[in-house]
């Protein structure tokens, strides 16, 4: 029995009370509020809302066994928060006169709810027909343009022309819903979060004036094969996960679309064809937007400045990427094309950054074109790891090869470095196991990291000019290469442990006059038969 003078059932009061089956409330109860998660997972079958209750909190009756809610005609109830009856078993619901805040998703997952009856005197909501409740976008509005609720057992629906917003979770989990139609004069502007998530619709044609499809709007609609967006559509935004896990086969985007949000088409296992018009205004394709899809080719729209993380991750059928000459693309982000099927790609001049693992672990990538005058400054970690490229051109502006940048590129034989290269650092494992045959050390290179060229067994020649600024060769840098001779430039300061370990073809090491060497590890040339030619003032390093 709820005490007569109790005004509030506090947050979580009866949460997880799995044996609670009955709640008695006095007829003249002073209760005014039922707070968040008050009765979560309770086994009560019915509940009468006292007349003075003004608010029911978020998830208050979530996962309850409740089937019947009694709300008196004179109820003062004004607000039902999000997910208040989430996954409950209610079958019928009355919206009283004073109800003005029926929050989005209030009956999410309540799949037995077939009838919602609105008081004729309610100022904000009304029944459109026996299946639909409509509402005003704000309490001040006089226009009923928001679809608030739909019968959870409905099989087909035509959205009234005057509806401008389909509210959050309006049709979510309507497992019998197979058909949604919009009239030619539809005024629909927005489909909100999870509006048709997990329905059984098979196709949909969007109205012209639609500007936004919210996150999860059609997510997990496993029978959805066809979406039609008119060429003159006003659609601007496709939200996160909007079509994730659908069976869409083709999609054509309108020119005015500006944003495809993260994972919008992830796991669309039938999506092979994506059409983007040449005059597209698309400005952002966010993280993982098309990951794990079988798309076969893609043209990067001209105004895209960044290909975000994981956008084409695991797109194993993706063979061709086209970047137009007027492209504004500047950044290819982390794992953007990770494990995809691209065979070749031409990097435009204005690209400034290719991030970690952007092209790594390709089974088919054989050719990548980068112009010498490219604005690219750094080749990040594992950018081209385990690709099949056989040649690479390094632009003059590149200052650093990060670790494992070309590791295990087992076809890479030729590295073209611009004569005016600004390269300063080659980090650890950068070319590990690559079969390159010759390498030119750029004049401004200061450091060769550990294992940088280790196990490059075809590497016989390393060219170093008289003007070289090379200062440090770290441990195992040239381990197990086939270098025949090597000249240590005068600016070199440190030759670390096992730098040339097991270089069995190495015959001559020449250390220049006027050298600045401060340290040579005793095993730097271990397991070689090289003759070391040193200035007389350096003999003490080898005594």
Describe each PLM feature range.
Residues 1-8, 18-33, 42-55, 64-79, ...:
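Structural signature of tandem-repeat unit edges
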Residues 143-145:
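Short coil-to-beta-strand
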């Amino acid at each position: 029995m709820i005490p007569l003078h109790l005004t509030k059932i506090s947050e979580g009061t009866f949460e997880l009370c799995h044996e609670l089956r009955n709640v008695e409330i006095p007829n003249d109860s002073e209760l005014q509020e039922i707070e968040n998660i008050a009765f979560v997972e309770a086994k009560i079958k019915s509940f009468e809302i006292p007349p003075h209750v003004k608010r029911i909190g978020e998830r208050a009756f979530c996962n309850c066994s409740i089937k019947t809610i009694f709300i008196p005609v004179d109820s003062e109830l004004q607000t039902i928060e999000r997910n208040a009856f989430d996954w409950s078993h209610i079958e019928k619901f009355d919206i009283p006169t004073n109800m003005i805040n029926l929050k989005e998703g209030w009956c999410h997952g309540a799949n037995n709810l077939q009838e919602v009856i609105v008081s004729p005197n309610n100022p904000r909501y009304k029944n459109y027909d026996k299946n639909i409740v409509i509402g005003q976008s704000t309490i001040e509005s006089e226009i009923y343009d928001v679809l608030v609720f739909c019968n959870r057992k409905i099989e087909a629906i035509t959205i009234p022309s005057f509806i401008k917003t389909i509210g959050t979770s309006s049709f979510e989990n309507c497992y019998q819903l197979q058909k949604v139609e919009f009239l030619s004069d539809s005024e629909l502007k927005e489909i909100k979060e999870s509006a048709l998530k997990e329905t059984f619709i098979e196709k949909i044609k969007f109205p012209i004036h639609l500007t936004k499809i919210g996150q999860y709007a059609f997510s997990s609609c496993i029978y959805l094969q066809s979406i039609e967006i008119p060429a003159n559509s006003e659609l601007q935004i496709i939200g996160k996960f909007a079509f994730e896990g659908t069976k869409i086969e083709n999609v054509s985007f309108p020119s005015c679309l500006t944003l495809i949000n993260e994972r919008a088409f992830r796991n669309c296992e039938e999506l092979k064809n994506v059409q983007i018009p040449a005059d597209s205004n698309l400005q952002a394709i966010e993280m993982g937007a098309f990951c794990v899809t079988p798309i076969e080719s893609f043209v990067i729209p001209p105004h895209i400045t960044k290909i975000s993380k994981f956008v084409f991750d695991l797109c194993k059928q993706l063979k061709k990427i086209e970047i137009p000459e007027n492209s504004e693309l500047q950044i290819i982000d982390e794992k953007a094309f990770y494990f995809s099927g691209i065979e070749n790609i031409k990097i435009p001049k204005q690209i400034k950054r290719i991030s970690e693992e952007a092209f790594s672990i390709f089974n088919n990538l054989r050719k990548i074109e980068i112009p010498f005058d490219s604005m690219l400054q750094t080749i990040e970690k594992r950018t081209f790891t385990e690709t099949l490229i056989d040649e690479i051109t390094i632009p003059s502006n590149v200052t650093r090869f990060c670790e494992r940048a070309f590791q295990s590129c087992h076809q890479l034989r030729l590295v073209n470095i611009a004569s005016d290269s600004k390269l300063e650092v080659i980090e650890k494992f950068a070319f590990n196991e690559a079969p390159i045959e010759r390498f030119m050390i750029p004049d401004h290179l200061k450091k060769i990291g550990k294992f940088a060229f280790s196990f490059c067994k075809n590497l016989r020649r390393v060219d170093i000019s008289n003007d070289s600024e090379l200062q440090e060769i770290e441990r195992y840098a040239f381990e197990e290469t086939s270098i025949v001779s090597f000249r240590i430039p005068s600016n070199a300061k440190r030759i670390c442990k096992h730098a040339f370990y097991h270089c069995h073809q190495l015959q001559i090491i020449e250390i220049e006059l006027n050298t600045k060497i401060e340290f040579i590890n005793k095993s730097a040339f271990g397991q070689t038969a090289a003759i070391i030619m040193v200035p007389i003032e350096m003999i003490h390093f080898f005594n």
